[in-house]
From Swiss-Prot:
GO cellular component, one term: extracellular region
Expression (tissue specificity): Expressed by the venom gland.
Cofactor(s) named in the record: Mg(2+)
Major location category of this protein: secreted
Protein's name according to its UniProt entry: Dermonecrotic toxin SdSicTox-betaIIB1bviii
SS bond list: C45-C51, C47-C190
Catalytic activity: an N-(acyl)-sphingosylphosphocholine = an N-(acyl)-sphingosyl-1,3-cyclic phosphate + choline; an N-(acyl)-sphingosylphosphoethanolamine = an N-(acyl)-sphingosyl-1,3-cyclic phosphate + ethanolamine; a 1-acyl-sn-glycero-3-phosphocholine = a 1-acyl-sn-glycero-2,3-cyclic phosphate + choline; a 1-acyl-sn-glycero-3-phosphoethanolamine = a 1-acyl-sn-glycero-2,3-cyclic phosphate + ethanolamine
Compartmental location: Secreted
EC numbers on record: 4.6.1.-
Reported function: Dermonecrotic toxins cleave the phosphodiester linkage between the phosphate and headgroup of certain phospholipids (sphingolipid and lysolipid substrates), forming an alcohol (often choline) and a cyclic phosphate. This toxin acts on sphingomyelin (SM). It may also act on ceramide phosphoethanolamine (CPE), lysophosphatidylcholine (LPC) and lysophosphatidylethanolamine (LPE), but not on lysophosphatidylserine (LPS), and lysophosphatidylglycerol (LPG). It acts by transphosphatidylation, releasing exclusively cyclic phosphate products as second products.
GO process annotations (BP): killing of cells of another organism; lipid catabolic process
Family listed: Belongs to the arthropod phospholipase D family. Class II subfamily.
Length: 274
């Protein structure tokens, strides 16, 4: 999975897909009451990027629904995964539950259209810190209460704050989540990061019977040397400001026979068995 990073303006969706991304990540900004308002990162952000691009969240969902719906004029077959980077660290943890309710309802109304949409992308909920886990509980409660619990099959969980992996496991255990879990490891492209935690996550992913990590991705990679390093370690995905660079690396002799781009037929919740 090649995730286009910080795709917050509607016009950026095609831009990143044209560069080779098959997944996009966008930031969701909330008001003080936990209501999702806009797709927006803000300052600071990655080096060399404009931090202020934005869209109304519901309008963004309406557009991305079309982009991921077969036979729609805007349909792009390659886009199979949407990563929602939830900026919960900007609001009180007490509002995390309200935020989870709101995002679930907006997805129901504007993406899935309560069963009337054929939009097919998988959804990855990126939670910044484990202290905000009530967002996940609220999201699942809302799908159940609204009568659309089946959409849980389309939704995965990912904690992005580089916290202790055992601490993350404990929170997932509290929530009763034993599947559909991704684990991110990374840092803004402005800085270098070692591989110790990334290797630990990959080791846990590959441990038989360990159900708290199904996929691992590294972020935000812009240098080809770091992309190669991550691929050699065996990541499932790369988040990048430059998907075209990832494509070029994947075509190199060392990787061409080991990796391919994920398609809609690849289940993002299953561990890869090579």
């Amino acid at each position: 999975w090649i995730m286009g990073h910080m795709v917050n303006a509607i016009e950026q969706v095609d831009e990143f897909l044209n560069l080779g991304a098959n997944a996009i990540e966008f930031d969701i900004d909330f008001d003080k009451d936990g209501i999702a308002q806009i797709t927006h990162h803000g300052i600071p952000c990655d080096c060399g990027r404009k931090c202020t691009k934005k869209a109304i969240f519901t309008e963004y969902l309406d557009n991305i629904r079309q982009v991921t719906t077969p036979d729609d004029p805007k349909f792009r077959e390659q886009l199979v995964l949407l990563a929602l980077d939830l900026k919960l660290q900007r609001i009180s943890s007490a509002k995390a539950y309200r935020a989870g309710e709101d995002v679930a309802k907006k997805l129901l109304d504007h993406y899935w259209q309560r069963g009337n949409s054929r939009a097919r992308a998988y959804i990855l909920l990126n939670i910044p810190l484990v202290e905000d886990y009530e967002f996940i509980r609220a999201f699942k409660d809302t799908l159940k209460n609204e009568g659309y619990e089946s959409y849980n099959d389309r939704v995965g969980i990912n904690f992005t704050g580089n916290e202790d992996l055992d601490k993350i496991r404990d929170v997932l255990e509290i929530l009763g989540i034993h599947k559909q879990v991704w684990q991110a490891d990374g840092i803004t492209s402005c800085f270098a990061r070692g591989t110790e935690r990334l290797k630990e996550a990959l080791e846990k992913r590959d441990t038989p019977g360990y159900n708290y990590i199904n996929k691992v991705y590294a972020w935000t990679l812009v240098r080809k040397s770091i992309m190669r390093r991550s691929l050699r370690l065996g990541v499932d995905g790369v988040m990048s400001n430059n998907p075209d660079r990832v494509i070029k690396v994947l075509k190199e002799k060392e990787f061409a026979d080991k990796f391919r781009l994920a398609t809609y037929n690849d289940n993002p919740w299953e561990k890869f068995r090579g």
